[in-house]
UniProtKB/Swiss-Prot annotation:
GO biological-process terms attached to the record: AMP catabolic process; pyrimidine deoxyribonucleoside metabolic process; pyrimidine nucleobase metabolic process
Protein name: AMP phosphorylase
Gene name per UniProt: deoA
UniProt-listed InterPro entries: AMP_phosphorylase, Glycosyl_Trfase_fam3, Glycosyl_Trfase_fam3_N_dom, Glycosyl_Trfase_fam3_N_dom_sf, Nuc_phospho_transferase, PYNP-like_C_sf, PYNP_C, Pyrmidine_PPase_CS
Protein's UniProt keywords contain Transferase: yes
Reactions catalysed: AMP + phosphate = alpha-D-ribose 1,5-bisphosphate + adenine; CMP + phosphate = cytosine + alpha-D-ribose 1,5-bisphosphate; UMP + phosphate = alpha-D-ribose 1,5-bisphosphate + uracil
E.C. designation(s): 2.4.2.57
Length: 503
């Protein structure tokens, strides 16, 4: 059928095509049928939804979908039934526990990106991967397909280094130190980062406090070739676009298939042209990987996948049993990270982890002899070279290179929790800290978060401050206080835990 485009002033986040009920009846189209909207060489696929918001002879598409294509208001298009994609058969094959061939995986990924697969079909694929898994042949094929269906970065400066943490630890602003340290040593490190999904601040959320993070691929190439590094948001790029779509299904189902997680991380490294990749796997209670045994198994998978992609991968299994540094939340973390770069000093957990990871990268890149990388990283940090490089990165990304950490605004609605008893800090609950910071407004409210005054093993007296909640709004502060009282994120115990009498 022929119809005219009507742009709906809404952002659906889905490829839904609104069709008038009379038109649908005449064209024998039903809700959720896949259709192709075509005009010349332009085409987009979407699922049918019947609606009286569009008149007869019109087809409605939301503005966010139109932004990705070049259709215009009133343009005449053909609405063509698309049938069931062949990739659905391949998804059913994986649902039955069978191994997928490379061409079948490529078809599934291509149809996800082209929006030929509906949400229910994508969810079925993700669920099948959770239940039946993927072997390394399938993971490698999935990784390459996810990368090659999006944009690829080609930077002349070599070698290209990269670092990625699988996350789970609150306050992980480590890479904001790692990147300028590595770049100051003459290596190239184009770092793309995510925004927070379930955490209180992703690296991109923190960097956005003092510099722009949204750039095109061409702009990133110019920045990196000028200063040797960047700290940007990967979501603004068309890197491994299938990943962004499957993540929505994972989030809705609260699952994270290992094979898909490996492909998600490594496809973006592959697309960025990374040659040497360091994977940080935090391990401990309250993070994604709780045991060293799990971490070692995952490390072997990353290394093997890297070999198949032509990348040299090393893995650092790091301590993740409590927050890194003393701050959680975008602005608070920005202050702490920039202060550490500016002075060469900071919380032990932050400095040790940052220089440890940077040191491994320096050795991988051949600028530090084996066993000397961490020492070299510390020298670069303490000499001020890392701060000078960070200022170059900030300026290249549109920020003020003369920024002062203490001038970064933080939430002025505060509440401080104090120790109810004297003793030693025996545990800090990562998940509770994250939940409280999010309740306070992080990461959407940049100034919201938590400032920690104690860490595990430290002695406290009754009445000593433990942590302060920062918020930008009183209502959010109240929510965070209620949650903190309920979860009690910091545990304090005496040396004598319990007395049992002789009964």
């Amino acid at each position: 059928m022929k119809a005219k485009i009507r742009i709906l002033d809404m952002f659906s986040g889905r490829y839904t095509v609104l069709i008038n009920e009379e038109d649908a009846k005449e064209a024998k189209l039903h809700p959720d049928d896949l259709v192709k909207i075509e005009a010349g060489k332009k085409a987009v696929y979407g699922s049918v939804a019947l609606s009286n918001l569009v008149g007869k002879g019109e087809v409605g598409i939301s503005r966010d979908v139109l932004d990705l294509h070049n259709f215009s208001e009133g343009e005449t298009v053909s609405v063509i039934p698309a049938g069931t994609p062949e990739s659905v058969r391949y998804i059913k094959k994986k649902m039955h526990g069978e191994k997928l061939r490379k061409v079948e995986i490529e078809a599934i990924v291509r149809d996800i990106v082209d929006r030929k697969l509906r949400d229910i079909e994508i969810s079925s694929f993700v669920t099948a991967l959770e239940i039946n898994g993927l072997d390394m042949d399938e993971i490698a094929a999935l990784t390459i397909a996810m990368a090659e269906t999006g944009d690829m970065l080609d930077i002349d400066r070599k070698p290209i280094m990269d670092v990625h943490s699988i996350g789970g630890v609150p306050g992980n602003k480590t890479n904001i130190l790692v990147v300028p340290i590595v770049a100051a040593a003459g290596l190239t490190i184009p770092k793309t980062s995510s925004r927070a999904i379930t955490s209180a601040a992703g690296t991109a959320d923190v960097v956005e406090v003092f510099a722009d993070v949204s750039f095109s691929l061409d702009e990133i190439k110019r920045i990196v070739e000028k200063v040797g590094a960047c700290l940007v948001w990967g979501g603004a790029l068309n890197l491994a676009p299938a990943d962004d779509i499957t993540i929505k299904a994972e989030r809705a189902l609260s699952i994270d298939p290992t094979g898909l997680m490996l492909a998600s991380i490594m496809s973006k490294k592959y697309a960025m042209g990374s040659q040497y990749v360091l994977i940080d796997i935090p391990t401990g209670k309250g993070v994604k990987v709780e045991t060293v045994e799990e971490a070692r198994s995952l490390a072997r998978d990353f290394i093997e996948l890297g070999k198949r992609l032509g990348q040299y991968v090393e893995v650092a299994i790091t301590y993740g049993g409590q927050p890194i540094g003393h701050t959680v939340g975008p602005a608070l973390e920005a202050r702490e990270a920039l202060s550490a770069l500016m002075t060469g000093k900071g919380p032990g957990s932050l400095i040790e982890k940052a220089t440890g990871l940077a040191g491994i990268l320096l050795e991988m890149g051949g600028v530090a002899p084996a066993g000397t990388g961490k020492k070299m990283a510390k020298e670069i940090l303490e000499s001020g070279k890392a701060w000078e490089k960070m200022k170059e990165i900030i300026e290249a990304q549109g920020g003020d290179p003369n920024i002062k950490p203490e001038e970064i605004p933080i939430g002025d609605k505060t509440y401080t929790f104090t120790a109810a008893t004297s003793g030693y800090v025996t545990a800090i609950d990562n998940r509770a800290i994250t939940a409280i910071a999010r309740a306070a407004g992080a990461p959407e409210d940049k100034g919201a978060g938590i400032e920690l005054y104690v860490k595990v093993g430290e002695k406290v007296k009754e009445g000593d401050p433990l942590f302060t909640i920062h918020a930008e709004h009183e209502a959010r502060l109240d929510q965070a206080i209620v949650l903190a009282r309920r979860t009690e994120p910091i545990r304090i115990e005496g040396m004598v835990l319990q007395r049992i009498g002789n009964i």
